Curated annotation (Swiss-Prot):
Residues 225-235 have a biased composition (Polar residues). Its main location: virion. GO terms for cellular component: virus tail, fiber. It holds the Pfam family Phage_fiber_2. This is Major tail fiber protein S. Belongs to the tail fiber family. GO terms for biological process: symbiont entry into host cell; virion attachment to host cell. The keyword tRNA processing does not apply. Coiled coil: none annotated. It comes from Escherichia phage P1 (Bacteriophage P1). The keyword Metal-binding does not apply. Residues 225-247 are annotated as: Disordered. It comes from the Viruses. It is found in: Virion. The gene is S.
Length: 247
């Protein structure tokens, strides 16, 4: 008995012609496009872990994702109108910079239907993801699929990059889910305070504050008085007392 192979063919529409497009379907013609559209509009672009810029010795900028027990970076970029691509950093990367310039260090992701990148074809000169060091100007804008890692402002007279030259204030850091902590002394910016932490902070502040009366030498609580014959220096006159004196 011979094996029989059944071949079926279907005709599919252009995805651009559809008013609604759902997740990966049976007989999906372009799987890469289907997967790369899955989280567009759900996962915001930005850095979720790693991609930390540091001095790399001399005029080198090191970008690493080794941070404590974390050894890989994760970032999300929007590409075109419909796609989202996740980029992982698995190894440290060093960029050689020059003195006397201000740089924008950019992470760039790429996806184009029908285009091979070096990630899947060694004959391609197009990178699926890469770091780019560009001259920074006040009118500088990010392009499609790009995220700003940091800016680096290097004076002309230096021979080594320092941490003070690296500015990450404009980069977009993201988090899916938030860790909750009971600590009232933590300096972390990626952890939310629990109800217990709020109560601890309130109780601590309350225990440290003791109300005191105001006087001519210190600020504090003031009690009002309508008396017109008082010698007190810790009480304040009411409008009634002032009126009585005036009358």
């Amino acid at each position: 008995m011979n094996d029989v192979t059944v071949v079926t063919s279907v005709t599919y529409p252009s995805s651009e012609s559809l008013a609604l497009v759902a997740d990966v379907q049976y007989h999906e013609p372009y799987l890469s496009a289907a997967l790369n559209r899955k989280f567009r509009g759900i996962v915001d672009p930005g850095f979720y872990a790693g991609f930390l810029p540091k001095p790399g010795g001399g005029m080198n900028l090191l970008i690493t994702s080794v941070d404590g027990d974390k050894t890989a970076g994760a970032a999300s970029v929007d590409i075109g109108e419909f796609y989202q691509v996740t980029i992982q950093q698995r190894k440290d990367i060093s960029l050689a910079l020059s003195a006397g310039k201000k740089y924008a260090i950019v992470l760039k992701g790429r996806y184009l239907l029908g285009e091979d990148t070096y990630q899947v074809n060694t004959a391609s000169h197009i990178h699926a993801a890469e770091f780019v060091a560009r001259t920074y100007t006040d009118s500088y804008q990010l392009g499609d699929g790009e995220l700003l890692v940091c800016t680096v402002n290097i004076p002309a007279s230096v021979s080594a990059i320092t941490q003070e030259m690296i500015d990450t204030s404009e980069r977009i850091n993201r988090s899916i889910g938030i860790d909750i902590s009971d600590s009232v002394t933590s300096t972390r910016s990626d952890v939310a305070a629990s109800s217990l932490a709020v109560k601890k902070a309130y109780d601590l502040a309350k225990s440290k504050y003791t109300a005191q009366d105001a006087s001519t030498t210190q600020k504090g609580l003031v009690q009002l008085s309508s008396a017109t014959n008082s010698d007190s220096e810790t009480m304040a006159a009411t409008p009634k007392a002032v009126k009585s004196i005036k009358d």
